[in-house]
């Protein structure tokens, strides 16, 4: 009874708190699918939710409710075992949907109580071409529901214990920038990421552009009290060439993306795949603007 009463009081306090960038905390829905194929996706959600975040792992089973109850119970048991075995502070959920693509919106809207509704939805980057159109429809749905998007393109092994590490945030404008830096900072606070340098990177065509953008990046890091190194790359080479030259040996890259217009999904997917062919594990983000480190 005591624990429940404390939870209730704290939820009431959260309800009355005015939302701003200073008290923003990640509340994350992670769609994991087959758990043993998305281990690094789970790992990233754990890093992002460290200490102050709430992370729900979601497995969606498609089918009729009456036909899938046993499968749901087995899946939930497997997820609980995985969480306990790996000592993760994550919350499992298994949902039966007749159709995932049409049921996603209702699930996200109905998940959790008002003060701790999810503000981030995480997916793994699709591997099968047959899922591309559906994947982008999901991103569009999440955007319409005013949630931040985080997609992890997993290139597997990316950490060496005890070594110096680098996280590169490539800045291409203001829409996603603050959110990218916040994610990089949250990840860097985990013990696995000790000795990490966060680099705020931007490509400009000439020396005249360098000073303005360098000051902007330095100002954002200072205002947010995040230790980060701002680096401006002067180059007229393609963005892909610059990215490969400066970040191929980094441990993690964070990039902003936009949701393509209907009919442009395959072209967008192909362009991202080409851009990141030689890159390490990359987090692709689409921000709703609720994190503004300049405010």
Functional labels for PLM-detected ranges:
Residues 1-295:
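Membrane-embedded alpha-helical bundles that form conduits across membranes
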């Amino acid at each position: 009874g005591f624990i429940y009463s404390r939870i209730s009081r704290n939820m009431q306090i959260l309800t009355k708190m005015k939302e701003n960038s200073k008290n923003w905390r990640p509340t994350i829905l992670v769609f994991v699918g087959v758990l043993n194929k998305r281990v690094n996706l789970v790992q990233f959600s754990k890093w992002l939710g460290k200490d102050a975040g709430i992370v729900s792992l979601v497995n969606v089973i498609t089918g009729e409710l009456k036909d899938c109850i046993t499968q749901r119970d087995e899946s939930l048991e497997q997820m609980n075992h995985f969480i306990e075995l790996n000592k993760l502070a994550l919350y499992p959920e298994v949902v039966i949907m007749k159709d995932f693509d049409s049921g996603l919106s209702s699930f996200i809207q109905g998940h959790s109580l008002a003060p701790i509704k999810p503000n981030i939805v995480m997916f793994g980057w699709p591997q099968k071409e047959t899922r591309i159109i559906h994947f982008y429809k999901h991103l569009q749905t999440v955007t319409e529901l005013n949630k931040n998007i985080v997609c992890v393109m997993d290139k597997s092994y990316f950490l060496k214990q005890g070594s110096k590490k680098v996280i590169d945030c490539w800045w291409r404008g203001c829409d996603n920038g603050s959110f990218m830096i916040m994610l990089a900072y949250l990840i860097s606070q985990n013990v696995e990421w000790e000795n990490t340098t966060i680099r705020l990177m931007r490509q400009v065509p000439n020396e005249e552009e360098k000073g303005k953008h360098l000051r902007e990046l330095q100002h954002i890091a200072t205002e947010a009290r995040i230790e980060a190194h701002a680096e401006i790359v002067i180059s007229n080479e393609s963005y892909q060439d610059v990215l490969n030259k400066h970040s191929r040996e980094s441990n993690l890259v964070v990039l902003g993306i936009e949701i393509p217009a209907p009919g442009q999904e395959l072209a967008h997917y192909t362009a991202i795949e080409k851009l990141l062919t030689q890159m390490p594990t990359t987090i692709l983000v689409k921000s709703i603007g609720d994190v503004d480190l300049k405010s």
